[in-house]
Amino acid sequence: MEKKLLLVVDAQKDFVYGALRNEEAIKRLPNLCNRIRNWKGLILFTQDTHHENYLETQEGKNLNIPHCIEGTDGWEICDEVKEAYKEIYGDMTLPTILKKSFGYDGWAEAQLDKLGITEIEVDGFCTDICVISQVLVLKAMYPEIKIVVKEDCCAGLNEKKHQAALEIFNSCQVEVI
């Protein structure tokens, strides 16, 4: 029996409306919300999580735009995403993984293969940073689980970088739909 997981990466206010505001993310957010509403399977969310010392970190030195600082409004999952989840699951808390870097490093403990997961769809923001990091970590950890990315449910920092990430997915045997 097929068992699917939808991993929604960093659908946070700072990536859509805030510090790293992105018109493509604004445009594609309704697609992501519809995907959540219509998903038949498990759903997990990741939440990019930084602290006040962000600009002193390696990431902050390279992307010197403070964003997703824990406890701020920009750190929160977008209201539209929460509402889409709530329509299906009621007041159940969003199952969220707080991550301190581009990719979550706890997938080994999750034992997704032992849970019978046969396919993981990874969607969200930013395609060229956190989405690609999650995809490649998952592909390395679980080479026999099918990994899929829905192009119109993701957005990069810009369209050129988004397209470049999609090309890399294809090279790494990740299905882009």
Question: Residue locations for each model-derived region?
Answer:
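Active-site acidic carboxylates
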Residues: 1-96, 118, 148, 163-171, ...
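Short strand-loop junctions, especially beta-strand C-caps/beta-turns
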Residues: 18-20, 125, 152
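Histidine-anchored nucleotide/phosphate-binding helix
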Residues: 32-36, 132-142
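Alpha-helix C-cap/termination motif
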Residues: 38-39, 114-115, 141
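Short beta-alpha junction loops
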Residues: 49-50, 152-156
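Catalytic-loop motifs flanking and including active-site residues across diverse enzymes
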Residues: 73, 77, 127-134
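Conserved N-terminal glycine/acidic-rich loop preference
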Residues: 97-131, 155-177
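Short hydrophobic/aromatic-enriched beta-strand-loop microsegments
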Residues: 143-150
